[in-house]
């Protein structure tokens, strides 16, 4: 009897061992099978891979992308708040008189367009391009805004800034606060007219991407957008001063040379090169484009050729199907293809003391 029980226990132990062995082998085989299948959700992807995949889905559009002279450029869908195209669009660059877009909208929001502005010696002494404001004389805010936006007069920009901000430093603070408010964290302005400048914090700069967002705000999202568009769409403006009649002409050629441009601002300094920012509209689709470092003297028309290329691309079928991810904001050109690199937005700048 004892011998029988021992044999019985041995058989049970053997059966248990075999069962455990079979289960273990089955689990191992199952795991390897899952590994081979690479089931969704089991793979690890870096954020860089995710950015590459976003671009990869549009590589077939690369041959249709505009060929530009600009060092930095961007094309922005103002409704979706996404970038359709970008080249070095988060690089900090001098941006010349495109600064006046923000100068104009801050002035419209903070002051009355019918204010009377007394001209300081500082404003009167600004370099060309200038209206020739006379220190001590008074002008209407509206006339100064038209002079700044149509003819890009530097003295008008300073007079507006001092009136609205109390000083150019005070106005720069208002500009940088507005830039931060609308998400333009790559922008830092020192002068209201965009002339090159530096201080202890940084140099006067923006990015192609930020300038698109600034234009989008000015043209469509500010409570003063209607007034802004009225000013920037005016082809010729005339008013009377003590010095006689003044006539301003709009230098935004795209208003008459394309069917879609509704606003724009040019710019140039030796450091910035030729610059241009515009708002375009077709069939209710609202977009902005920006160009920085778009040639230097003897290549003044590069910006118009580039702008037209971007406008044509913006209203084409290719652009309607394109998408540049928020992470895809800095680009490198390699042959006929475009590689987008990951960009991380900086933290909001402390501008309380600037």
List each language-model region with its residue ranges.
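N-terminal secretory targeting signals
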Residues: 1-70, 322-345
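Active-site-adjacent loops and short helices of periplasmic peptidoglycan-processing enzymes
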Residues: 36-209, 219-221
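Short clusters of small/polar residues that mark proteolytic maturation junctions
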Residues: 86-88, 291, 353
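Solvent-exposed alpha-helix faces
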Residues: 108-109, 216, 349-350
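Domain-terminus/edge residues, biased toward the C-terminal soluble/receptor-binding domains
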Residues: 184-185, 200-345
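Single conserved hydrophobic/aromatic residue that forms the stacking wall/gate
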Residues: 343-354
């Amino acid at each position: 009897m004892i011998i029988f029980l021992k044999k019985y226990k041995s058989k049970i132990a053997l059966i248990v061992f075999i069962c455990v062995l079979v289960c273990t082998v089955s689990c191992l085989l199952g795991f390897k099978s899952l590994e081979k299948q690479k089931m969704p959700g089991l793979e690890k992807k870096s954020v860089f891979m995710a950015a590459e995949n976003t671009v990869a889905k549009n590589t077939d559009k690369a041959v249709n992308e505009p060929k530009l002279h600009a060092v930095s450029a961007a094309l922005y869908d103002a409704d979706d708040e996404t970038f359709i195209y970008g080249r070095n669009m988060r690089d900090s660059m001098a941006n010349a008189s495109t600064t006046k877009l923000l100068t104009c909208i801050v002035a419209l929001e903070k002051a009355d367009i019918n204010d009377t502005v007394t001209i300081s010696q500082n404003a009167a002494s600004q370099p060309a391009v200038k209206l020739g404001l006379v220190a001590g004389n008074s002008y209407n805010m509206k006339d100064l805004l038209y002079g700044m936006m149509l003819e890009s007069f530097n003295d008008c920009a300073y007079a507006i800034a001092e009136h609205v901000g109390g000083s150019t430093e005070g106005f720069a603070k208002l500009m940088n606060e507005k830039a931060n408010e609308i998400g333009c964290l790559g922008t830092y302005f020192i002068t209201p007219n965009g002339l090159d400048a530096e201080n202890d914090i940084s140099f006067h700069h923006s990015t192609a991407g930020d300038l698109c967002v600034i234009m989008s705000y000015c043209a469509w999202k500010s409570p003063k957008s209607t007034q802004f568009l009225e000013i920037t769409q005016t082809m010729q403006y005339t008013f009377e001063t003590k010095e006689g009649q003044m006539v301003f002409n709009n230098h935004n050629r795209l208003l008459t040379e394309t069917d879609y441009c509704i606003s724009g601002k040019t710019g140039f300094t030796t450091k910035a090169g030729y610059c241009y920012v515009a708002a375009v509209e077709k069939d209710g689709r609202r977009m902005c484009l920006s160009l920085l470092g778009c040639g230097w003297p003897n290549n003044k028309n590069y910006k118009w050729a580039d702008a037209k290329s971007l406008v044509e691309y913006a209203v084409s079928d290719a652009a309607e199907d394109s998408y540049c991810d928020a992470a895809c904001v800095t680009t490198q050109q390699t042959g006929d293809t475009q590689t987008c690199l990951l960009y991380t937005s900086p933290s909001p700048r402390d501008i309380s003391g600037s």
